[in-house]
Amino acid sequence: MRNRSMRRLGLTLITAVLAVGLAGCFASGTGTKQLGAENESTSAMPPAEGADKTQEIDPNISAELTLWVYYKGFDKLIPQFQKLYPNVKVTVKDFLYASYENEFLQALADGDVPDVMLVDSAQFGSFSSIKGVENLLDPPYNAGQYEKDFSEALWRSNMSLDRKRLVGFPLSSSPIVTYYRKDIMDKYGFPSEPKALGDYMADKDNWLNMAKTLKQDGIYLTQWDPEIVLNFERTQSFFDDELRFQRNNELFKEAIDIAKVIHDLNLAAHLDVWTSSGEEAVRKGSIAMMYMGTWGGDQIKAWAPESAGLWRETRLPFNLYGWQNSANFILPSDGKNKALAWKFIEFYVTEASKNGMAGSVPAYLPARGNPKELASVNPYMGNQPVYALHEELVNKMAELVPTPLDAKAAAIWDKMLAQGIERKMDTATMLDGIEERIVSSLATEIDILKRNLEESSP
């Protein structure tokens, strides 16, 4: 990243954190532009008249909007908005998931931004503590009027780290789902209907029994030893609201103990489904269970179209209800048509979502419970009503609150977790070591964030 442009981000809580963590990528200096300074939060001020309403826009307005997204296909939805604003041209640019975060941040740094960005929750922590993005609680957006129309956890996950600004407006939220081969469960005498299998796998001994039985014939329920721990990770974030590490607990002791059994009994396939050999294993049925978001069914169909009717979906093993991700709109402060851009965001979240989202679960609670969506079936999944399952699961899970420290913490966690399992370390000792390493490695960043949070408190 270039110093000359990254200085312009005008960081709030995370200025010094990133300066330390990125070894000088963010330089200090005078005369730098403070992006979004003109849009400081007014949430502490008395609401102005009409502050609970959104600014009206002339439907005949002639304008252009640009939307940046991290997946393909959104352009097909644009005609819905253009029915309301026929003279508005909307250009959609999609980016590769692997690189979009850096490109979006660089655009915010340069001030060369689109009108709207769509950001995945996995990277949201990078955007939640910087200037250059609008506080959607402020006029003319007044998004606070919708707070009760979202789950409390999802709303909190879209707030800034100090909980004073609403940085994102969520479009959808996805649980993590178990995908499994029904025919293989039938063949080996295990429960094969979605509810029955989900209930059976709630007991870890039952899941391990399945894994041991199927492994004898070269069939696997997990790709690698620590994969099962990922399902537990989807239920609890690294840090609490006080930035204290919160994964050194009984839940993760159980997760690691299961992963250690998988390692000791060689129950993992040691294949990655995102490789050619992994895809082949999916096609052959060597991998009979996977854990993905609600998009997983389409992905399996792409890998193994000939397996139509053989796959089903159910809840996670071990009685877990985990969150995969959410898609969140953010509004760059340097956008040229911010009021219209907010109308665009508001429309897709609170109106268009009521008509169904191609199997995704709307973040907006009034858009859920659509009878047509609930009754829809997926032919590839043996005509299973998978959307109804997705809504059931999303209502039982809780979204997690991201922090700017999560990526660094995850790198330490993943490495030490894999090493600890491989070396057969005592579980409690392993977790103590991971906590100590994360807390000590990120001590400077944690201290800076805590001090800034204290200073921002009323």
Residue ranges and their predicted role:
Residues A98-E101, I219-E227, T235-L316, A339, ...:
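Extracytoplasmic ligand-binding clamshell segments of periplasmic binding protein
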Residues A327-A407, A418, T429:
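Mature extracytoplasmic/periplasmic domains
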